[in-house]
Amino acid sequence: MKKWWFNSMLSKKELEHGCGLSKSMDSLGPIENTSTKEDPSLNDPEKQIHSSRNSESSSYSNVNHLVRGIDIQNFISDDTFLLIDTKGDSYSIYFDIENQIFEIDNDHSFLSKLQSSFSNYWNSSYLNSRSKNGDTYNGHSLYYTNDSWNNHINNCIDSYLHSQIRSDSSILSGNDSYILSYIFNESGNRSESFSKRSITNGSNLTRRESSHNLDVTQKYRHLWVQCESCYALNYKKLLKSKMGICEQCGYHLKISSSDRIELLIDPGTWNPMDDDMVSMDPIGFHSEEEAYKDRIDSYQIKTGLTEAVQTGIGQLNGIPVAIGVMDFQFMGGSMGSVVGEKITRLIEYASNKFIPLIIVCASGGARMQEGSLSLMQMAKISSVLYDYQSNKKLFYVSILTSPTTGGVTASFGMLGDIIIAEPNAYIAFAGKRVIEQTLNKTVPEGSQAAEFLFHKGLFDPIVPRNLLKGVLSELFELHAFFPLNQNKGED
């Protein structure tokens, strides 16, 4: 493994020039290799680092000598880049493309020091002279605030990494990868340690943080939940009282089936059904990584559930209801034979008792470890729903949460008399990655979101989580299902 030394004071133009980025740094095209001959100073580390350590003035010549004279593909094959400021503080980036590793040693003092150095350099007479000659970066503004400086650093690394990764498509394949880490210090103030967006042809690139950051992240993990949309951190103890809704942007985070039951069902009225029913690996599914039975056991320990759905009877504002709630935390909410059987028995019970039915969907689809048996659950549940709705003339409400995909979407998820979706829920039959890999077509962004599908007529209302219980209560009363105490008062 090699180690390279960079002077830290780089303008965007110089990084483009020194690294051979002939295109805009904001574009995501491949880096073009330069044809400059190798400089002898590349083989002499002392020559590479003298200007950054022995001079307080800015210098970029080492970067030009370093990068332009070597093959850019091999440049980050297995190298550690050590960026140092004028005071000698270091900041290292380790690349190993072959083993798909990108490791950053985060130094909290680095960005602030680098920002100060960059500001001085940006206003230097050399850069001003280049501006007078018209040598500016695509006419972009030369004024940088604190936020734009962070964005500038992130964009430079984004473009550079993306170009390198795309040049070797045999290594990576898959979807976009978004990585963002937040660290909390002892006083509880948030500091964004580093942010980057790696848009690649693959999702297998991993980022390893320094051991210090991992320790801090693990230390505060039990206190905070990060929003999937705005990346804000929500205090975990308060998040439950807010029904799992991000207080910064209003995004509906995933919540457990138990939390959802607590949200919808009146306290003290929940009576679970068939909670002792477990899968017995009906087809003897073989896996080299982990046996199916062992995987079931591990998820049971992790979630405290026996399967990916909870079913039972309860009251919603005094109205008796049969409710099934799927839990995405248990094997992605996948539908196996036990899940199908529990939902089938719930529907049959609701038919016999003439009570309304609610099923909250959160699933990746049929469970592959049970083969055709899991697929048959689609037909079994649909047939018993036909009897419940068409013959008994009873009322079924389907609630689609994020994500609802595959066999659940193709069966009982879309069979409700009223189909309700949560805001920004991901609802689809085939996932985006599957469609793109199968048809070689790009799926438009947001085309599988609830708001887009609502305008296509796929379901009825989009109801925020905090209003859901009231909406369901009004729907039931509209269909002549009234609270028990109200019926007794009328008698």
Swiss-Prot record:
Protein residues bound to Zn(2+): C227, C230, C246, C249
Subcellular location: Plastid, Chloroplast stroma
Cofactor note: Binds 1 zinc ion per subunit.
Pfam families given in the database record: Carboxyl_trans
Cofactor(s) required for function per UniProt: Zn(2+)
Keyword annotations from UniProtKB, A to Z: ATP-binding, Chloroplast, Fatty acid biosynthesis, Fatty acid metabolism, Lipid biosynthesis, Lipid metabolism, Metal-binding, Nucleotide-binding, Plastid, Transferase, Zinc, Zinc-finger
The reaction(s) this protein catalyses: N(6)-carboxybiotinyl-L-lysyl-[protein] + acetyl-CoA = N(6)-biotinyl-L-lysyl-[protein] + malonyl-CoA
Pathway assigned to this chain's UniProt record: Lipid metabolism; malonyl-CoA biosynthesis; malonyl-CoA from acetyl-CoA: step 1/1
One of the record's GO cellular component terms: chloroplast stroma
UniProt function note: Component of the acetyl coenzyme A carboxylase (ACC) complex. Biotin carboxylase (BC) catalyzes the carboxylation of biotin on its carrier protein (BCCP) and then the CO(2) group is transferred by the transcarboxylase to acetyl-CoA to form malonyl-CoA.
Quaternary organization: Acetyl-CoA carboxylase is a heterohexamer composed of biotin carboxyl carrier protein, biotin carboxylase and 2 subunits each of ACCase subunit alpha and ACCase plastid-coded subunit beta (accD).
Family: Belongs to the AccD/PCCB family.
Name of this chain's protein: Acetyl-coenzyme A carboxylase carboxyl transferase subunit beta, chloroplastic
Organism expressing this protein natively: Spinacia oleracea
